[in-house]
């Protein structure tokens, strides 16, 4: 196995273990800690911290520590959050959620920088296009990473599975499910009893163990990017001054392409929050019961994982524009269905089909967005990925902010609007890229013609 691919698999498996723990724990926050809104407050604090972290920390940590040790250090923040859940209260969850948020942006920026650099080095080595290898590496990563949703939800479903004591769902409650949910209908009663402390400790022990294994895997087996560059004969760049690094995230906004593309990560945050927050609560839990949430999310994660690998493979044949068109078409269709559909207990397959379709489209945003930012901003990868996480965090914060007081139908219309803006911005950037490429090609042809003319005269 080639060394670059081995490194990609190490990063992927590390993230798989880490987010098997974090993803499962995140989905249970609002259910386990509903008293005085502690769970929702924890998630809101977490993503606000991610937003602040995205502005400053990623370029600094990556420049000072390198991609490998930035990933290791950031993973430690996730494990601390898991430990904080063993004695859950305002004094443990809020500080540890802030710490996790501070580590999240550097973690993802380092991952994006690492995979992009590895892809470009491998492309030079084998004589392929850099964007094709980068797309392939992101496809492999998200195939492995997205399966964490399967394992995380499966673990929680198995641990809490014996507790399911389903009650009949009243017809009055079904009438307020779906897009009609305006937080004024009857409260969902078809939930399980609160799990015992022993079961919670069992689950947290498994999740914490997964996080520790992730740290050890990356620390021991991942090759340092700086060592890799030296081995490939690349010169290690001299670190820029601290203030230059601090400002690099914001200075990149002078590139109009970034301004146009920021709606893509913004929409990514919106759509992820909708599925995990609104779909699971207003559709699945409301109509089927909370014990079905894990299984529906497994379907989503499995489809996202499989499609991530598929898109990474076929992008060099179809081009990224076709994949973005596919992703947008699927989400447009799903949003329309969500607006018109009245969920019912007799329509069980529909819940899984819609979850799977949402996963097909989510795979486009996850693989292509990361590859797009890595390819377009190759010279400024760290600030580019920091801005990507900033946009995604803003999407999460806004969506969590209005989640408690807007009807689901209104949230769907907002989602539709942001998706439209994202596609317009992306389409404009593609047009600018084609236009710039044609200018370069025209200039090369002109120079070639002039050279031939000079040779003829001689």
Curated annotation (Swiss-Prot):
GO terms for cellular component: plasma membrane. InterPro entries: Ion_channel_UNC-93 (IPR010291), MFS_trans_sf (IPR036259), UNC-93_regulatory (IPR051951). The keyword Transmembrane applies. It comes from the Eukaryota. Glycans are attached at residue 190. The chain crosses the membrane at residues 8-28, 42-62, 69-89, 90-110, 140-160, 202-222, 258-275, 286-306, 321-341, 345-365, 390-410, 412-432. It is found in: Cell membrane. It holds the Pfam family UNC-93. It is a multi-pass membrane protein. Keywords: Cell membrane, Glycoprotein, Membrane, Transmembrane, Transmembrane helix. Belongs to the unc-93 family. This is Protein unc-93 homolog A.
């Amino acid at each position: 196995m080639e060394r670059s691919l081995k490194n990609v698999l190490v990063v992927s498996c590390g993230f798989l273990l880490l987010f098997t723990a974090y993803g499962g724990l995140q989905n249970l926050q609002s259910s386990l800690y509903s008293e005085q809104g502690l769970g929702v407050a924890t998630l809101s604090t977490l993503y606000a911290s991610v937003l602040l972290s995205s502005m400053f920390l990623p370029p600094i940590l990556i420049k000072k520590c390198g991609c490998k040790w930035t990933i290791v250090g950031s993973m430690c923040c996730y494990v601390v959050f898991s430990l904080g859940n063993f004695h859950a209260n305002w004094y443990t969850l809020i500080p540890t959620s802030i710490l996790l948020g501070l580590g999240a942006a550097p973690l993802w920026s380092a991952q994006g920088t690492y995979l992009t650099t590895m892809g470009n080095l491998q492309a030079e080595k084998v004589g392929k296009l850099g964007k094709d290898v980068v797309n392939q590496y992101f496809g492999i990563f998200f195939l492995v990473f997205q399966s964490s949703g399967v394992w995380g939800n499966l673990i929680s479903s198995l641990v809490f599975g014996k507790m399911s004591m389903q009650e009949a769902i009243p017809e009055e409650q079904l009438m307020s499910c779906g897009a009609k949910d305006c937080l004024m209908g009857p409260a969902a009663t078809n939930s399980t009893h609160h799990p015992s402390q022993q079961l919670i400790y069992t689950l947290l022990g498994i999740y914490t163990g997964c996080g520790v294994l992730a740290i050890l895997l990356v620390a021991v087996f991942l090759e340092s990017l700086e060592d890799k560059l030296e081995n490939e004969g690349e010169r290690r760049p001299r670190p820029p001054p601290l203030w230059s690094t601090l400002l690099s995230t914001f200075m990149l906004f002078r590139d109009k392409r970034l301004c146009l593309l920021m709606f893509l990560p913004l929409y990514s945050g919106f759509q992820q929050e909708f599925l995990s927050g609104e779909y699971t609560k207003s559709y699945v839990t409301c109509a089927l019961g909370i014990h079905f949430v894990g299984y529906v999310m497994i379907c989503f994660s499995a489809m996202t994982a499989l499609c991530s690998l598929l898109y990474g493979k076929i992008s060099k044949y179809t081009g990224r524009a076709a994949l973005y068109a596919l992703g947008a078409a699927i989400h447009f269709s799903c949003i329309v269905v969500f607006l018109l559909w009245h969920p019912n207990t007799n329509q069980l397959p529909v819940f899984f089909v819609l979850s799977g379709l949402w996963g097909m489209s989510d795979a486009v945003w996850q693989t292509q967005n990361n590859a797009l930012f890595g390819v377009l901003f190759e010279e400024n990868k760290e600030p580019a990925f920091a801005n990507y996480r900033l946009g995604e965090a803003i999407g999460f914060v806004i969506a969590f902010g209005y989640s408690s007081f807007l009807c689901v139908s209104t949230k769907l219309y907002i989602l539709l609007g942001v998706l439209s803006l994202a596609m317009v911005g992306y389409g404009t950037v593609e047009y600018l890229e084609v236009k710039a490429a044609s200018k370069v090609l025209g200039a090369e042809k002109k120079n070639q013609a002039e050279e031939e003319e000079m040779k003829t005269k001689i």
